[in-house]
Regions:
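Active-site-proximal helices and loops of the catalytic beta/alpha 8
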Residues: 14, 18-22, 78-81, 85-91, ...
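Substrate-binding/active-site clefts of carbohydrate-active enzymes
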Residues: 1-3, 7-87, 107-116, 120-123, ...
């Protein structure tokens, strides 16, 4: 059927990329499902929803997985790991990291490493950076987190605040190693980008 066709096309994409020395990163969401999906008891409801909680609230009213439940966590880890087993995906970009327990991330990383010892994950820990990442770096969870500080630092640099940026980079670089990395970005679908900040700032 159409699902098999999509799977075949996805496999062809990965195979052709690998033939050309290109690695494939896939975005995954473990915290929640899409609107109008039915995962039964895996989804938080009623008193299970804790308003204002990073990990037990329903983000934007999306169906929130009860990741604190070991059975739910294990199923989510199994699903994500199966993608790597089936298709040979190289990396994951992990959405909404702060909204899932650290134990789940450690379990996912362990499971993925059993499939591919070189597998890497970069996490989106909203608002985080090298000094603030919910202990997801250097702990066997994420290999890297997106650096939310970098956007501001790039803006500061262009505005001439070079010494403060140099100080930031020196501090950041002193803690980075192969289990504690940051991924730089200048904008995303969740926040204003570098260009918008500069234009709105009159530059």
């Amino acid at each position: 059927g159409s699902e098999m066709c999509i799977r075949d096309r996805f496999q062809t994409l990965i195979d052709q990329a690998h033939n050309r020395g290109i690695r494939i990163m896939v975005d995954i969401v473990v915290n929640h499902a899409g609107y109008d999906t039915d995962f039964g008891d895996m989804i938080r409801s009623g008193d299970d929803i804790v308003s204002g909680s990073d990990q037990k609230d329903s983000l934007s009213n999306l169906p929130d997985f009860k990741t604190e439940d070991p059975a739910v966590s294990a199923q989510l880890v199994k699903w994500q790991t199966q993608w790597v087993k089936d298709f040979g995906i190289d990396y994951f970009r992990v959405d909404t990291v702060k909204h899932v327990e650290n134990d789940t991330w450690a379990e996912l990383k362990n499971a993925l490493t059993e499939v591919d010892s070189d597998f890497k994950m970069i996490g989106e820990y909203a608002g985080g950076g090298y000094a603030s990442n919910g202990n997801t770096l250097g702990t066997g969870e994420m290999d890297s987190d997106l650096d939310f500080d970098f956007n501001d630092q790039a803006t500061n640099f262009v505005k001439g605040n070079i010494s403060s940026v140099e100080s930031f980079l020196t501090s950041r670089n002193s803690v980075l190693n192969n289990t504690y990395m940051t991924g730089q970005f200048l904008g995303s679908h969740d926040e204003d980008g570098f260009k918008k900040k500069l234009l709105d700032g009159g530059m």
